[in-house]
Amino acid sequence: MKNEHNKNLDRRDFLKVLGGAAAVTSATLLPGCKNKQESAYTATTDIPTDQMTYRINPSTQDRVSLLGYGCMRWPTVSNNSARDSSDDIDQETVNKLVDVAIAHGVNYFDTSPAYCKGRSERATGIALSRYPRDKYFIATKLSNFAPSTWSREASIAMYHNSFKELQVNYIDYLLLHGVGMGNGLQEFNARYIDNGVLDFLLAERQAGRIRNLGFSYHGDIKVFDYLLSRHDEFKWDFVQIQLNYVDWKHAKEVNERNTNAEYLYGELSKRGIPAIIMEPLLGGRLSNVHDHITAKLKQRKPESSVASWAFRFAGSFPGVLTVLSGMTYMEHLQDNLRTFCPLDPLSDADKEFLEETAQQLLRYPTIPCNDCKYCMPCPYGLDIPGILLHFNK
């Protein structure tokens, strides 16, 4: 249901919000600055170590945990997320998070050369290298966003550096990162086709140094459709898409450039391509909802966290191989383990309930910010996503 106020806050109203929220920013109360989202997570209880839900990759028979660890937000020594902070990554805490995750059956870890300001792969590699190589699947990306990395030589150098940082001699899941961004197909061709990089990656898969090759999709639907139209040629092993109970039917109401997850998932499903799910919480917004929505969710399932509803939605589709969550803090990991150990799939009535919830969320006069931070840094020193997220709350 469209909300015109949602899209068209007038300049005066926005500046009022900006000024008020900027004051809160200085007091370090903003979710974009530091937020453990404590209200979304229940107290720690015993979590079984042998009840993780797994899915089978049809092309490789990999037995993949339905909860995947997104490594974009590793904690820093200042107890912030390394996505936002330049402080040193707290490797000891990263190791502990990985230990708890693996002990409870998580075996899929998703990183990128771009994550944590270029430090995620190294921290992830240090933590995982303490385990036998067959205990985990590592997913990383060819994140050649900058034109300076579009040459064949620069892109291949980035690819080889991932092996070094991750301390591995093969990559389980390699993604073309963020296809559809920027100028759509023109940019995709410059990054992967005109320079011969996709041909190189296909050869690497043939040689066994890449076990599964896919892409993560953002933005221009023409690129998504084009790549699937060439599936017989490229034989995509998986595709990473944004899927949550708002984007399922209302993606364009959140961001006009987005496409409904119902369509994206459906196109993958009819081709038998496994889906990897990103943004199950819509940039954290589905774990930090309006108080009225929180009460509604708690009334239906009092013992469950607000976030668990979104994760159960994403995990309930049979074509989903794993659902990614960027877990900075132990309480986030613990809550997600409760959700997936094992997963309690949604009923049809539950899905209808969440569709009603999505429509209610869209009626609130919010600004469509996913905390991606592509608008940062601000030349005036403002925490733009923090301000917008504070307004939304």
Task: Annotate each language-model stretch with its function.
Residues Y131-R152, H177-G180:
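Structural motif corresponding to the early beta-alpha repeats
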Residues D87-V100, S151-E165, I221-L228, A307-A310:
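Short, acidic/polar
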Residues V64-G68, Y108, K135-A139, Y170-Y173, ...:
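Structural preference for beta-strand elements that scaffold enzyme active sites
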Residues V179-L382, G386-L389:
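Beta/alpha (TIM)-barrel catalytic core signal, keyed to glycine-rich beta->alpha loops juxtaposed to Asp/Glu
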Residues K2-Y136, N169, F200, Q206:
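N-terminal binding-site loop/beta-alpha segment at the start of enzyme catalytic domains
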Residues N57, Y69, F109, T124, ...:
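Conserved, mostly hydrophobic/aromatic
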Residues A154-L175, A203-A207:
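CE4/NodB-like, metal-dependent polysaccharide N-deacetylase domain
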Residues T49-R55, R122-G125, M158-Y159, I221-F224, ...:
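Alpha-helical scaffolding within the catalytic cores
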